[in-house]
């Protein structure tokens, strides 16, 4: 008789709204390790929440937070449909005994003592502080989307970009802590663990291990403390002085929750400071503790998180045996021995290579780990992850009380019924983006642009009038009138449009909507070879290609990263807005929003077509798995939005009065003087006309054979805004431009400007990320694509009789 086993149930098969217990996690390599680090470990209760509108990916809830993963990856996770155990955390009883329950049911934890308790972990009489002139270096580390960059801005007075989707910080940023001269804090990319799954995690790990800061400020989201403490445990293993900033405590209290901060300190062996970075609460005490532990080099009191009696002591014995075997190697490699042991035990090959163990030592370590696997009943990676989450569960049970559902989560669920609903998500996304364009280009931005344009024109007339009254040289008058006010002034008038667009994009970003867009669009993007996470750099690309290229570092796959970088320039950056607005106002004044929206969607469509070509040629294969945490919706912070708008306005003004000003002056000079350096009466006889004559034939097939147009396009290589200033200088007036170009030629020009190569700063960013060869190929390819599309538009229009 043949024994036929019943088919296994996978997470993919779990009905929505149902819960089950994970029994095993499939996959291999860094992907499987990432699953484990995100909490998808055996014996964990998981609930299927919803699927994306296109049916994939799947949203699940575990450990009191929510993740998204594709159905193909969910199929690798075996579950058993057993009821999840319900436990009442003892912390509720402790809090009630400590402070009582206030009317209304809000638990009141003991007040957290102020600074002065920091020295209780060590006897100061046996310690020697660092010299007063020693520079105290700190690493600011934490999960993505935990308020880390907000805290960095608060500590340093900097105004780094703050957003409510994973992956805002993509490079290290340094700053001084307030008025403390000999301090330096580094804002590191947000990570979930010290396993190098993505390039940002590798950057953070290499910094912490290589540069060894004097102290670590670990910021933890108190509303999602279970998820965040997983990284905390690995940071403690680095044996570096450390303080934990328990952020968003205001939200915890507002929801009727609480944290026994003093008990949490005892459990972790480091100072814990409750703060609210958004409200600037608790940061003074945090700074005092951080300076204290760094100056006295107070190392974490606890690094051992597994009990000797837990599961027969298998993991405990394994880790301590490995520590004994590798102690000398870890010291020579400059690596904390506990960290090295736990990483070896979970199978981290990078750490194993750095330790340089000989063959006998490798075999001894492997024997210890194999024995642990047999005793524990789990593979090595799952056993270590289980050890960490078991400790976190014990700590949270003893210190944390949460409501059944926070107000933020309930609100997010209601909003998501529309914004991620099966039939409403795509229409909502299209509607939101069209509303942004309409308000920017037809209502708010257009109104303030007209006001500023009138003001600049009036100022220009006033200054020229003064120069004429003073009988200033005519050539100098031309420089001021045509070069400065005609060129730079024409660009400045578009500042309101750029600020307005960034205002709306920052609202969407801060609120948490961008993460939902990634969730909704993942299946669609996968068809062109990308991951849903690629939507984040691409959406940033609508603002500026430089940070968009940098944001691609958050992608764990080199294939996805390269493909995203090459496609990002097709997302029209804000520097091109003045070109669109200028030409649209001149040739299509009644159809501004339609033309603008059409250009943006055309850029996306061309990018999709190029992606399909690249997917089938240079970038064959599948996109990496989509594992992402969905943050709750939050009200955008007025301070963050204000800082972002000021940064963008300041950057635009700096470019206007540096690169664009210089380009305008050069263009004016070349257009005013002939080859004999005498002023020419006809600009067609100028130096510039001779130079531009070489490239003009390239644009003749689409009706753009005027040398002034090719000159403007060449100036756009320096800065896209220079196209407008150059046209303004060379044509002198909008009427002259309209007389020189047909409407169809103007449309072809718009399409070419949309698609041709980005500015030199963006090209330099691509070169830094991918190398010079890739950057050069991108420039050539985009120019070819732009020419073909522009000519196609012109040819189609001419065939239909619109020429």
Which residues make up each language-model segment?
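Conserved C-terminal guanine-recognition region of P-loop GTPase G domains, centered on the G4
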Residues: 180, 203-272, 579
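Alpha-helical transmembrane helix bundles of large polytopic membrane transport and channel proteins
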Residues: 243, 253-404
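Extended, low-charge hydrophobic alpha-helical regions
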Residues: 375, 382-383, 402, 443-483, ...
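Core alpha-helical transmembrane segments of integral membrane proteins
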Residues: 419-519
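Hydrophobic core segments of alpha-helical transmembrane domains in multi-pass membrane transport
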Residues: 428-439, 501-506, 584-586, 599-613, ...
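Juxtamembrane inter-helical linkers in multi-pass membrane proteins
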Residues: 458-462, 515-545, 620-644
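Transmembrane helix-loop junctions at the membrane interface of multipass transporters and ion channels
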Residues: 570, 574-597, 761-771, 792-803
């Amino acid at each position: 008789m043949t024994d036929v086993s019943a088919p296994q149930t996978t997470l993919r098969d779990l009905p929505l709204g149902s819960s089950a217990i994970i029994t095993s996690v499939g996959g291999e390599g860094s992907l499987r390790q990432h699953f484990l680090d995100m909490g998808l470990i055996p014996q964990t209760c998981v609930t299927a929440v919803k699927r994306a509108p296109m049916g994939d990916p799947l949203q699940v809830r575990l450990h009191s937070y929510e993740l998204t993963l594709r159905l193909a990856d969910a199929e690798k996770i075996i579950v058993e449909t057993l009821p999840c155990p319900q436990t009442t955390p003892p912390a509720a009883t402790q809090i009630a005994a400590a402070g009582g329950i206030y009317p209304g049911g809000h638990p009141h934890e003991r007040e957290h003592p102020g600074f002065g308790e920091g020295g209780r972990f060590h006897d100061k009489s046996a310690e020697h502080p660092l010299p007063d002139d020693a520079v105290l270096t700190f690493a600011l580390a934490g999960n993505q989307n935990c308020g880390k960059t907000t805290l960095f801005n608060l500590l340093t007075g900097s105004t780094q970009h703050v957003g409510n989707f994973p992956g805002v910080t993509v490079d290290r940023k340094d700053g001084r802590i307030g008025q403390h001269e000999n301090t330096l804090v580094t804002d590191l990319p947000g990570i979930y663990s010290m396993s190098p799954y993505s390039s940002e995690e590798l950057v953070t790990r290499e910094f912490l291990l290589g540069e060894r800061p004097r102290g670590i400020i670990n910021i933890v989201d108190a509303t999602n403390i279970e998820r965040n403490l997983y990284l905390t445990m690995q940071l403690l293993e680095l044996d570096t002085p450390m303080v934990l900033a328990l952020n968003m405590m205001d939200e915890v209290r507002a929801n009727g929750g609480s944290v026994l901060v003093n008990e949490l300190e005892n459990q972790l062996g480091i100072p814990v400071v409750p703060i609210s970075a958004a409200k600037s609460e608790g940061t003074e005490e945090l700074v005092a503790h951080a300076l204290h532990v760094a100056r006295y080099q107070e190392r974490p009191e606890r690094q051992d998180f597994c009990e000797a009696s837990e599961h027969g002591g298998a993991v405990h014995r394994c880790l301590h045996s490995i520590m004994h075997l590798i102690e000398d190697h870890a010291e020579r490699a400059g690596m904390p021995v506990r960290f090295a042991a736990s990483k070896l035990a979970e199978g981290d090959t990078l750490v194993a290579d750095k330790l340089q163990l000989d063959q006998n030592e490798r075999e001894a370590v492997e024997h210890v780990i194999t024995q642990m696997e047999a005793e524990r009943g789990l593979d090595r990676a799952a056993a270590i992850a289980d050890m960490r989450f078991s400790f976190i569960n014990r700590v949270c049970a003893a210190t944390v009380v949460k409501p059944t559902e926070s107000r933020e989560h309930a609100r997010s669920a209601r909003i998501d019924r529309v914004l991620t609903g099966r039939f409403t998500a795509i229409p909502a996304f299209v509607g939101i983006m069209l509303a942004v364009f309409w308000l920017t280009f037809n209502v708010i931005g257009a109104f303030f642009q007209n006001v500023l344009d009138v003001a600049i024109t009036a100022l220009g007339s006033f200054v020229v009038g003064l120069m004429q009254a003073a009988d200033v040289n005519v050539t100098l008058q031309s420089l001021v009138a045509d070069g400065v006010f005609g060129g730079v002034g024409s660009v400045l008038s578009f500042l309101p449009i750029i600020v307005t667009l960034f205002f709306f994009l920052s609202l969407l970003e801060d609120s948490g909507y961008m993460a939902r867009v990634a969730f909704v669009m993942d299946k669609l993007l996968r068809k062109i070879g990308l991951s849903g996470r690629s939507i984040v750099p691409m959406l940033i690309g609508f603002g500026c290609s430089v940070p968009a290229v940098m944001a691609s570092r958050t992608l764990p796959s080199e294939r996805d990263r390269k493909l995203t970088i090459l496609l990002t320039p097709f997302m029209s950056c804000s520097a091109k807005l003045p070109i669109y607005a200028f030409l649209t106002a001149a040739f299509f004044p009644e159809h501004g929003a339609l033309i603008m929206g059409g250009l943006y969607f055309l850029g996306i469509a061309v990018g999709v077509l190029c992606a399909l070509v690249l997917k089938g040629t240079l970038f064959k294969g599948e996109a990496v798995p989509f594992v992402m945490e969905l943050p709750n919706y939050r009200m955008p912070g007025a301070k963050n939005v204000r800082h972002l708008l000021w940064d963008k306005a300041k950057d635009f003004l700096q470019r206007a009065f540096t690169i664009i000003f210089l380009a305008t002056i050069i263009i004016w000079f070349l257009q005013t003087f002939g080859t004999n350096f005498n002023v020419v009466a006809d600009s067609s006889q100028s130096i510039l006309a001779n130079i531009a004559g070489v490239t003009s034939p390239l644009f003749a097939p689409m009706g753009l054979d005027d040398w002034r147009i090719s000159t403007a396009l060449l100036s756009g290589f320096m800065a896209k805004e220079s196209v407008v200033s150059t046209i303004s200088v060379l044509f002198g007036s909008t009427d002259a431009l309209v007389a020189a170009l047909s409407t169809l030629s103007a449309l072809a020009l718009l399409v070419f400007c949309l698609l041709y190569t980005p500015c030199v700063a963006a090209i330099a960013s691509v070169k830094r990320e991918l190398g010079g060869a890739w950057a050069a190929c991108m420039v050539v390819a985009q120019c070819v694509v732009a020419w073909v599309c522009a000519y196609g538009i012109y040819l189609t229009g001419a065939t239909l009789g619109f020429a």
